[in-house]
Every structure is written in C-alpha cells, then in structure tokens.
Amino acid sequence: MMYKLAPLHCRPWTLLGITPQLIESHYEGNYGGAMRRLNALTSEIESFDLATAAPGTLNRLKHDQAVALNSTLLHELYFASLGGDGRAVPEPLAKALERDFGSVSRWRQEVIALAEGMEGGSGWVILSWVPRDGRLINQVGSDHTQSVAGAVPVLAIDMYEHAYHLDFGTNARAYVATFMRNIDWAATLGRYEDAIKSAAPRPLYQKEFADVPAITPEEVKALIDAGTVVQIVDARPRHFTTKSSEIMSGAVWRDPERLDDWINELSKETPVVTYCVYGFHVGCQTAIALRAKGFDARYMAGGHYAWKAMGGRMEQLDQS
C-alpha cells in the first residue's frame, strides 16, 4: 500500500502573520518528507523476510512507520486547521468546549499553556474527541510517537512484563502463543464492525470547483512511469515563475492569462494535466477553459508544491 499526499487545504497567501514561504517549506519539506519516509518504510515492510531478519528489525521498522504515519496525519490536520479568522467559535463547538473545559476562554488558556510549555522541545498539542467518554480533551503528543491519530483499537496485546510474569516468567514467546489461543474473535469482530461505522474525516475540497475533474500527483506519476503520453501545462501565474527556477519534469510553462495564444500547441487527442502553485483557482480555471474548448483536461490537486512534496522529478525552468 502506498500512501498519497493530501493537497494543501489552506490558502497560504490569505494567512495573517504567516508567510507563504513558511507554509511552502513546511508542506514540501516536513509533510512531504514524512510522506516519502512513510512510503519507503511501508515498501520495506511489505517485502520484509520474517524468516531471515535479525530479531527486533521489524519492530524498529514498524515503530518508524508509526512515527511517519502520525506525522503525515497530524500535518494534514494542522494545514486543515489554518485559514479562518480564529475569533468566533461556532455555537455547537463553543457549547462543547464550555461543557468539557468550563468555558471557551479556559480552553484557550489551556491550549496556550500547553503550547508554550513545549517551547524548545518537539511534539503536538491536539484537541481530541474521546468516543468512549463522549468528551473533548487537549492532548500533548511527544514527537510523533503517540497512538495513531483517530484510530479505533479493536485488539490489543499487553506486552508489559506485568501481563505475563506470574505465569510465564520471562518466557514472552510462550505468553504470546497462549494469548493467540485465547482471542475472543466474536468480540473482536463486534469491535471491528463498530469501528468501521466511524465517520472518516470530511473530505476537503473547493466547493466552487467540485465538478472539475482532478488528478492526484501520484496518478500523474503513474501515467508518466507507464509511458502514457500526457500534455502537462504549468499554469502558474508569471510572477510565481520568477520566484522559483524549478518546473515539473516534462511540463511546459504557459501564461494562464494568454491561453488563446498557446492553446493550438495542444492536441485534443492526448490528455492534458494543468497545475498551478497550490492547486487552487488558476490550475482549475485553466482546466475548465481547456475543457470548454474540447480538450480532455484535468487539474493536478495540490499543484506545484504537492508534486515537490511527493518527491516528483523537477528540472530547471527555461526563463528565456
């Protein structure tokens, strides 16, 4: 299984006091880097030879995979948390915060105290819903090593020594074998059936472009790797091309404001992929304009920075 990048949800140029450069670096380097590590580790685990590997090797890989997975999940939540004005809490959520923290103000104070208490360290402050207790909590995550965000456990083996020492001494292997023979699969099935009813995170998309066909960076790469001919148009506004000397390998830059000047360079017999900086308006609008002219055009979700975050090949942009 290969994990896929989520397009950047917030619009970096609209944030107050946070520069687009910070968001770009964070998304491309940190989130993209975590996604690349996650996929590399997942690939290594899937091809892992259990018969010949040294003891503990798989444990290390699974630990590192969990860290990378948590990093991607939390970064996606972080970017999805940005983009509002930060002032008015919607009434239903305000009532929930008042119920669980005493007041919205108290909740804010606690979040700030937790965040400031991590100064110079590393980790996360997370507002979480605990289904078992039916309440919200503030959670501190040390690095990325807490349990997977949003996961609902259905089976667990306690490997602390207190779980087996009285019967098995230090023979953990015998304990595990005995545990496996004592699993209540009917109860486990019940928990599984309950877990799959949990709603997945609400998909993030631009409502104004909901009907425009999109393609993910991973899907574009798969087409290229398969040798499929695709016309890739870098439709970043001209002023963005002066800020970056890189372009997606195999793409051509064309001014989105002068579409009529270059549209005849494209073939209606070959699929077209357009992209802009972040995968918002310009790439979508260019795809819409091309589709109106009879082209099989889609926009690449996440745009230039999603391609870079995925580790897609880049080349120098010819500015001549």
Residue ranges of predicted features:
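Short active-site oxyanion
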Residues: T228-I232, S249-G250, P271
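Short acidic-hydrophobic, aromatic-tinged amphipathic segments that line or gate anion-handling sites
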Residues: R254-D255
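Short amphipathic alpha-helical segments
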Residues: K243-E246, T286-I288
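Feature for soluble, non-membrane regions of globular proteins
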Residues: M1-L204
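Short, hinge-like loop/turn segments at secondary-structure boundaries
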Residues: S249-A251, M314-D318
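Flexible, polar/low-complexity N-terminal or interdomain linker segments that lie immediately upstream
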Residues: A195-K243, D318-S320
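Short, structured coil segments at secondary-structure junctions
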Residues: I247-S249, K293
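Catalytic cysteine-centered active loop of the rhodanese-like fold, especially the PTP/DSP P-loop
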Residues: D260-A309
